[in-house]
Amino acid sequence: MARDEAQMELLFKALADRTRLRLLNLMAAGEVCVCFFVEVLGESQPKISRHLAYLRRAGVVSARRDGKWMHYRIAEPADAHAARVLSEVMTWLGEDHRMQKDRARMENICCAPSLPVRLQGAPRPAAVPT
């Protein structure tokens, strides 16, 4: 399989998983700490990290470490076709009712006056898509 074909297959496999779509949805407005993904999606940190690693391999997510916190954001794919596919997926996610519920849950958690104990000390996301 040619490199472009392999990358295209990886991208479509990355986008074919509901958890990964939910993660992309929550990153629509910017960088998010893993701990917020865990809280909003109600999944274990190892499961979330595995899905984020898959998205990184597909070239649609980038990461940075800040002390003990890992932050993820959507990355622009190098390939123009992949970038268009991701853009269309993000538009669809923005319009999907279930994804809007995830964004509302994120807003309720990160914008609450006090964070849940599990998130104490965690950096809040800069913005939450509404």
Feature-to-residue mapping (PLM):
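N-terminal helix-turn-helix DNA-binding core of bacterial DNA-binding proteins
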Residues: 2, 6-47, 53, 69-78
